[in-house]
Amino acid sequence: MSYKNTNNSHLILFKLLLLLILYSADLTASSSCRSECGGCKCGGIAIPYPFGIGKGCYLEKSYEIECLNTSGKLVPFLSVISKEVVSIHLPGRQSFGSVRVRSPITSAGCSSDGKDSAPVMNLTDSPFFVSDINNLVGVGCSSKVSLEHIKQNMVGCELNCSTTNASDSNSIPFFDKTGCSFSYTFAQVCTGNKPEDMGCDGRGCCQASLPREPQQVIGIRIESNDGKSTTSGDCRVAFLTDEFFSLSKLTKPEQLHAKRYATLSLGWIMQTRNTSFVNSLACKIRKDTDTAYSNDQSIKCICDYTMSIISDIRYANCECNLGYKGNPYDSDGCRDIDECKENPKYCKETDTCVNFEGGYRCVGDKTKAIMIGAGTGFGVLVLVGGVWWLRKFLVKRRMAKRKKKFFKRNGGLLLQQELNTRQGVVEKARIFTSKELEKATENFSENRVLGHGGQGTVYKGMLVDGRTVAVKKSKVIDEDKLQEFINEVVILSQINHRHVVKLLGCCLETEVPILVYEFIINGNLFKHIHEEEADDYTMIWGMRLRIAVDIAGALSYLHSAASSPIYHRDIKSTNILLDEKYRAKVADFGTSRSVTIDQTHWTTVISGTVGYVDPEYYRSSQYTEKSDVYSFGVILAELITGDKPVIMVQNTQEIIALAEHFRVAMKERRLSDIMDARIRDDSKPEQVMAVANLAMKCLSSRGRNRPNMREVFTELERICTSPEDSQVQNRIDEEEEEDGVEEEEEVVTIVHRGDSWSIGVTAPASSIVASPPSSDVEPLNPLLTW
């Protein structure tokens, strides 16, 4: 009885000891993996972290590797997809990681039982995807193989064993999403290659590239050339693989079917919902560094955060910094590289290689290098300082010469002479520096352009004292045009009238002369009357009439009240500016002329704008004060009709001057037909008729029949108060019209020549002295000088 109990006790003890040994072996193997968590191996295949064998050795369930004993051999399996693992590679800086697995082969007509295999790879809800490094390979005859369940495109190739012509067999048809085929021809990139070393060309073997987009669900379909699925006939196989198949490696489909598997490369990303894991690695986020790698050698690894290409989950892509190697996903996985041991030739033979964390340095005799560096640095410093001082001196000297040259070329000496002759009459204007105006206009930016005039471009500027100004930068002019520029400065210096744009100063030290005017905020009259997009209903009749009075007052002052009568010579709606209260100001005196009291006309080259030029001035070559009156009459016609100075008659499609069209309509008593519709309802008919009659007098073909600007101004003021008392009668001098028919036809003809002219004919002007109304004129005190 005791002997039997003793035997039983020994048996139980032996079993317990055996179980303890087996458990210890398993625990040792498991703890060995867990101690490194990423340094495990299974069947000779390295399993780097975040993959791992056993609980605690992998990051998440998706990265779990099962090490199974298959036919007496340890084989790693990726448990989330139940696929045998061939190798695992960590992602680099510009690529994803890869896991090579054994994937089942799709077959048709190969099984003795008549059953075909068509497995579908489903990687949904995992960090894995089929990468474009793989190819679709088909082996067999008279079939088409294609991919199923993929996004965007349909990919496939055709098998044909009956083709004997080599030129026909080099083309592999691919299929797009519409079912149409296009050919892709393999090029022999290596000279001397044997034909059997080239890729599958469709004769018993074909292959096609996968789309670049990652795929998580993918299948393979085999069908006959007529497009029907088949389960009979010769054996045909198709599979995805990252291996290169050539004619020399071609295997019969039956042998491939017997293998059952092909090697497939799966891409993977470091997908984790727990960002604290990446934080625990103490890696630097790449966006915080200026370069691909960090210059801080104490940083062992660098990570990128981005959105997953296969899901809406953020993933991390990490790598060891320069000077380190290892697994960045393992805690303290990046270890220093000892460059001095790996390659002692990093340093010269005379130097000593010293390794440190993240790098190395070469230590040698520094005395000679320091002396050479100090001497070179001092010499370079002296040389650079000398060159800088010399350059500064030369630039300053050259700028002084340029300013002096520009001042002389831009008429500075001539302007000084003109202003000196008017000493005591003209107050000095401010002389602006080029730097001031460049700062005010942001270096004459295109965004500051207000408009382009006949003599230059106008910019909006802001002075340092906060004043907004208009800066007129003249065009490049020759010496013959300098008189016009100087003329404008001298004339505007004499003018002190609230309806004339005020000149604030000028700059002559630039390549082209620059004038600075007061800024008029609401642009020109032409824009408000004629531009279609303006749709400006502020231009009611009362405002138009007031603008006409303002212009007439300014011209009356220029003709009568200035120290010397001034003829503008370019009166037009684009030269009439409107301030914030829509009060008119006359601008652009580039072609103006000042005449002495005893002169009756001014002889000059004809200039002006088509539609505004006095026909008598054109015929007689004499510019008088009545020529400005004629141009003002055209503006009155614009205010009444809303038409441009040159119009196209709708009935005849004939291009004529507005002045002629207006006179004909008035003669035929059709004022209501040509009146601007925007003022028809709010205007007083008797006022419009009175202004129209006045415009007719101003547009008379003979200058002697026109009123002077003093009379025009007085009449317009009377019309504003009591239009029924207007002294201008609605009558047309028939004799005058008959005498001027030929002349007016000539005027109409020249309209077709363009918007402006300069014709080589001499012409003069007359001068009338009269007292301007006190309401519009400030004392004529000297304003500007040089």
Curated annotation (Swiss-Prot):
The modification Phosphothreonine is found at T433, T604, T609. It is a single-pass type I membrane protein. The modification Phosphotyrosine is found at Y517, Y617. Residues 31-369 are extracellular. The chain crosses the membrane at residues 370-390. Keywords: ATP-binding, Disulfide bond, Glycoprotein, Kinase, Membrane, Nucleotide-binding, Phosphoprotein, Serine/threonine-protein kinase, Signal, Transferase, Transmembrane, Transmembrane helix. GO terms for cellular component: membrane. It is found in: Membrane. Residues 766-786 are annotated as: Disordered. Residues 766-775 have a biased composition (Low complexity). The active site is at D570 (proton acceptor). Residues 1-30 form the signal peptide. Its EC number is 2.7.11.-. Glycans are attached at N69, N122, N160, N165, N274. GO terms for molecular function: ATP binding; calcium ion binding; protein serine kinase activity; protein serine/threonine kinase activity. Residues 391-786 are cytoplasmic. Residues 444-719 form the Protein kinase domain. Residues 301-362 are annotated as: Atypical EGF-like. GO terms for biological process: cell surface receptor signaling pathway. Disulfide bonds join C303-C318, C340-C353, C347-C362. It catalyses: L-seryl-[protein] + ATP = O-phospho-L-seryl-[protein] + ADP + H(+); L-threonyl-[protein] + ATP = O-phospho-L-threonyl-[protein] + ADP + H(+). ATP binds at L450, G451, H452, G453, G454, Q455, G456, T457, V458, K472. Serine/threonine-protein kinase that may function as a signaling receptor of extracellular matrix component. Belongs to the protein kinase superfamily. Ser/Thr protein kinase family. This is Wall-associated receptor kinase-like 17. It comes from Arabidopsis thaliana (Mouse-ear cress).
